[in-house]
């Protein structure tokens, strides 16, 4: 009986002959967390669009934010550059993106249980990425451009807005949040894949 239990325990770690390291385990947790946040962002954005009148949807679709506040953070411009980037670089960019949402995410909270998950989930993800950075650093300076970590909140974040501007701000925040969580999910997935030499990390 003990032998069967031992065999099941080994199989539960996966079919790979390679042991699962602490780094792989941390990456799996981080990827799972950002996937949850990305799905949550997609759901919130979809629910928000569904709540709009047709005229409001058309108006907001015309101003879809091509530029988000976090675009000040230098990141790979395409999938090829992403694949060429080092694990440490991808982790560093992911950390900056998550950190840039610490203040704006408060505006997304409230009103529903899913919305109230955003800030604590971001904090958990940020801590996990920080641990991964420390585990992968090799003496290089992780954040050479400290200004990137001090991004100002979205321009009208603290202002009292009229109904139309408030609607636009919410739309922009949700759209940019969805965009950035997709970026972080991509970067962490590629970085995690690098730990498995046999894996195909093609995007």
Swiss-Prot record:
Q: From the UniProt annotation, give the residues forming the signal peptide.
A: 1-17
An example Gene Ontology CC term for this record: extracellular space
Annotated residues that bind Zn(2+) are located at 36, 185
Q: What domain of life does the UniProt record list for this protein's source?
A: Eukaryota
Q: Which residues are annotated as modified residue Pyrrolidone carboxylic acid in the UniProt record? A: 18
- From the Swiss-Prot or TrEMBL record, state where the protein is found: Secreted
According to its UniProt entry, the protein's GO biological process terms are:
animal organ development; growth hormone receptor signaling pathway; positive regulation of growth; positive regulation of receptor signaling pathway via JAK-STAT; response to nutrient levels
InterPro entries assigned to the protein according to its UniProt record, in alphabetical order: 4_helix_cytokine-like_core, Somatotropin, Somatotropin/Prolactin, Somatotropin_CS
Q: List the disulfide bonds.
A: 68-176, 193-201
Gene3D superfamilies, A to Z: 1.20.1250.10
Which keywords appear in this protein's UniProt record, sorted alphabetically? Answer: Disulfide bond, Hormone, Metal-binding, Pyrrolidone carboxylic acid, Secreted, Signal, Zinc
Query: Per the record's keyword annotation, is Cytoplasm included, yes or no?
Result: no
| Molecular function in Gene Ontology | growth hormone activity; growth hormone receptor binding; metal ion binding
Member of which family? Belongs to the somatotropin/prolactin family.
The record describes the protein's role as:
Growth hormone plays an important role in growth control and is involved in the regulation of several anabolic processes. Implicated as an osmoregulatory substance important for seawater adaptation.
Q: Which PANTHER family match?
A: SOMATOTROPIN (PTHR11417:SF2), SOMATOTROPIN,PROLACTIN (PTHR11417)
Know the name of this protein?
Somatotropin
């Amino acid at each position: 009986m003990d032998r069967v239990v031992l065999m099941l325990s080994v199989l539960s770690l996966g079919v790979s002959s390679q042991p699962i390291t602490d780094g792989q385990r941390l990456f799996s947790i981080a990827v799972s967390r950002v996937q949850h946040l990305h799905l949550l962002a997609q759901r919130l954005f979809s629910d928000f669009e569904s709540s709009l009148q047709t005229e409001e949807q058309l108006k907001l679709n015309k101003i879809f934010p091509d530029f988000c506040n976090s675009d000040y953070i230098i990141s790979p411009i395409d999938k090829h550059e992403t694949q060429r980037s080092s694990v440490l670089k991808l982790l560093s960019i992911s950390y900056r993106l998550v950190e840039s949402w610490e203040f704006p995410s408060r505006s997304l909270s409230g009103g529903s249980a899913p919305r109230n998950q955003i800030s604590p989930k971001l904090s958990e993800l940020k801590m996990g990425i920080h641990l991964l950075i420390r585990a992968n650093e090799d003496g290089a300076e992780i954040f050479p451009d400290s200004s990137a970590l001090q991004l100002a909140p979205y321009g009208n974040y603290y202002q009292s807005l009229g109904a139309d501007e408030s609607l636009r701000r919410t739309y922009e925040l949700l759209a940019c949040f969805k965009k950035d969580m997709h970026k972080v999910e991509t970067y962490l997935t590629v970085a995690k894949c690098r730990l498995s030499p046999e894996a195909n990390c093609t995007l």
